[in-house]
Amino acid sequence: MPANQTRSRARERNNVLNRPEFMSLNQPIKSGGGGGGGESRGTARRPSQRQQQNQQQQGDNPQPENNKDKKELPEEDCMQLNPSFKGIAMNSLLAIDICMSKRLGVCAHPSSSWGSVRSMVKLLALTGHGIPWVFGTIVCLMRSNTLAGQEVLVNLLLALLLDVMTVSGMQKLVKRKGPWEMPPGFFDYLAMDIYSFPAAHASRAVMVSKFLLAHLVLAVPLRILLVLWAILVGISRVLLGRHHLTDVGCGFALGFLHYSLVEMVWLSSNTCQTLISIGTFNWSPLY
């Protein structure tokens, strides 16, 4: 008998069905409801059915908070799936402007491709700065002895001040940065030429050249050089990486506008003499 018991125990140990992972096969089949397999399938489907019902209820009764959040989203955060032709054209032109301006900034740094001529380009750009022109006009006005010369210089000074104030105001409104990250210099802060749009040097160069061509008697070579100077001043700002191409183009247009405004409100000789007397604290011409 003990030998038979040891044999039966050995058989039970070697039986595969006695392992823990196969214990469910030894359980009897439960009757009713289409069998145990049907119940297990039914119980397996119940969570998914509940989730579907919950989703349907949430779809029928949307939460007002989510709707409020969606309504409160700004238009900047929304994706424009169907942008207008005007928007596509503007974005394309801006991308071309930025790309070409970056490539033309060959004198932006000393290590650039044209870094050897950077000092000459900076000197050319300095000739269109507002501070030298304003102080130079004041010095010439103090040394002028003729009424006609003083009349021209006073109107030129007013044109320069108008250009500086208008360009600085537009730059602070737009606040566009240049194609290359460069901090403005000391003279730029004095002339309030901090941002990129519009190009102050280009506007001033066009206005001054147009003014001098209209009110000074110059030879043909000098007139040609004056026009080339205005164009090269605008190009130099692009080569230095300070402005985009559109900044310079708008600066040229703004310079023509300033010249037209000065011609419309041209101050007479008597008015200029009055302003000179007020500025020099010489009140005798007023009486």
UniProtKB/Swiss-Prot annotation:
Keywords linked to the UniProt accession: Endoplasmic reticulum, Membrane, Nucleus, Transmembrane, Transmembrane helix
CDD domains, sorted: PAP2_containing_2_like
UniProt KW Cell wall biogenesis/degradation keyword: no
SUPFAM superfamilies, alphabetized: Acid phosphatase/Vanadium-dependent haloperoxidase (SSF48317)
Extracellular domain ranges by topology: 142-146, 237-247
Topology with respect to the bilayer: Multi-pass membrane protein
Entry's Gene Ontology cellular component terms: endoplasmic reticulum membrane; membrane; nuclear envelope
Main subcellular localisation: nucleus
First and last residue of the signal peptide: none
PANTHER family tied to this protein: INACTIVE PHOSPHOLIPID PHOSPHATASE 7 (PTHR14969:SF17), SPHINGOSINE-1-PHOSPHATE PHOSPHOHYDROLASE (PTHR14969)
Name of the protein in its database record: Inactive phospholipid phosphatase 7
